[in-house]
Amino acid sequence: MDIIGGQHLRQMWDDLADVYGHKTALICESSGGVVNRYSYLELNQEINRTTNLFYTLGIRKGDKVALHLDNCPEFIFCWFGLAKIGAIMVPINARLLREESAWILQNSQACLLVTSAQFYPMYQQIQQEDATQLRHICLTDVALPADDGVSSFTQLKNQQPATLCYAPPLSTDDTAEILFTSGTTSRPKGVVITHYNLRFAGYYSAWQCALRDDDVYLTVMPAFHIDCQCTAAMAAFSAGATFVLVEKYSARAFWGQVQKYRATVTECIPMMIRTLMAQPPSANDRQHRLREVMFYLNLSEQEKDAFCERFGVRLLTSYGMTETIVGIIGDRPGDKRRWPSIGRAGFCYEAEIRDDHNRPLPAGEIGEICIKGVPGKTIFKEYFLNPKATAKVLEADGWLHTGDTGYCDEEGFFYFVDRRCNMIKRGGENVSCVELENIIATHPKIQDIVVVGIKDSIRDEAIKAFVVLNEGETLSEEEFFRFCEQNMAKFKVPSYLEIRKDLPRNCSGKIIRKNLK
């Protein structure tokens, strides 16, 4: 079944400009408070100018172009500008340092980079010291260094016509993007995403939160991440809604931005919810138009209830990963919600719980969450130049092994337990890090928490808790361990405690556990 009607991204934008014209498509707010607005017609023209810019720089169908940018209009221009010419976007996590950025450049075969002045010194060093195929760098800033092979993105773009000068044949099967996974435990892998994937993501995510053309979808998720692209941006544009892209998350500013732009849909991760709850309550907390708050794992029921009560919102749970493109398990529009379930499989997907021998398990038994989709259409196509890694997670018939553990009930509601790699083996027992973190997070003095397993010669692994306290609080080891003993089984109680100012996180808010010992 062809959900998208054979429509690639170039056709999508031409149609959107015709249908919605002067309706607001995109609003971008920078960290400095600068706001840029574009109608569907204006945004399509900016995308066309960007396509022409890339063509004048020698970019052709199949070429890879890296983007190392914070949330900004230029990211959107480049993303779809490359797609219109059949070239391939390689978004780089804006928080990555030299070694990781160089690795992605090398492994993606990117020949051109679009970035900003703050990241340029790093790429100067990469060009001098690392073997890459990089031929040219475009900077989004006005001021330019007097270096060869560097040009102004904005100046070049503004010199281009607003209609396409070059439009090669495109297919929905063409690769639109190679998105490298966050790599919290190992080197990132390049997830190959097609035009079909992105078009399907727009329709699916719009269905999931029942988007209409009068909706306003606001996000602070990074544009280089799958959530921003496929759950927010593609959904908003596919529905003809307004997409609000905020440069960076600020707990102090976020709720005001939701109110300012009259957002009807937004998305949150646990870190955002916890830091929002740490802000002083206001009489205006419930003065908003939010209909849905898309939510991604994982939160205790106490935290969820407190957040929903204070802000007068409800959470729409969505479970997925880069390889699934969208939240393939989640709450459905108009359907009942069953906390702490992560929901039921969405349309075009099947989901099962399987054992270590790849056999389906009955309701109530814990195993690996497996998803069936169509590679290159409803799930990712493959890992870039890595058939071995692809074969490890993706079966020939479209079953994807997520590496996550969970179970389902008799009505098809799924429940997330943990990442397999986050299960701690302690004296013959399997302990879920997420379960412990949800319990410990209910302590009134604790703002953030992660637990990890560390080697133990007697019990396989011991449990160590890393906590961040609320401002002005102190917490003794005696108080902490007493709380744990009162709220969890004895074998789950951590052996060690470390209080820190913050926890290492990647761009999507996930804890980088390999940095904690």
From Swiss-Prot:
Keyword annotations from UniProtKB, A to Z: Ligase
PROSITE patterns per record: AMP_BINDING (PS00455)
Superkingdom, natural source: Bacteria
Transmembrane segments annotated in the record for this chain: none
GO annotation, biological process: carnitine metabolic process; fatty acid metabolic process
Catalytic activity: 4-(trimethylamino)butanoate + ATP + CoA = 4-(trimethylamino)butanoyl-CoA + AMP + diphosphate; crotonobetaine + ATP + CoA = crotonobetainyl-CoA + AMP + diphosphate; (R)-carnitine + ATP + CoA = (R)-carnitinyl-CoA + AMP + diphosphate
CDD domains in the record: FACL_DitJ_like (cd05934)
Pathway recorded for this protein: Amine and polyamine metabolism; carnitine metabolism
Broad enzyme group: ligase
GO molecular function, a single term: carnitine-CoA ligase activity
Keyword Ligase applies: yes
EC number, as in UniProt: 6.2.1.48
Function statement: Catalyzes the transfer of CoA to carnitine, generating the initial carnitinyl-CoA needed for the CaiB reaction cycle. Also has activity toward crotonobetaine and gamma-butyrobetaine.
Family: Belongs to the ATP-dependent AMP-binding enzyme family.
PANTHER family the record matches: ACYL-COA SYNTHETASE, MEDIUM-CHAIN ACYL-COA LIGASE ACSF2, MITOCHONDRIAL
Name of the protein in question: Crotonobetaine/carnitine--CoA ligase
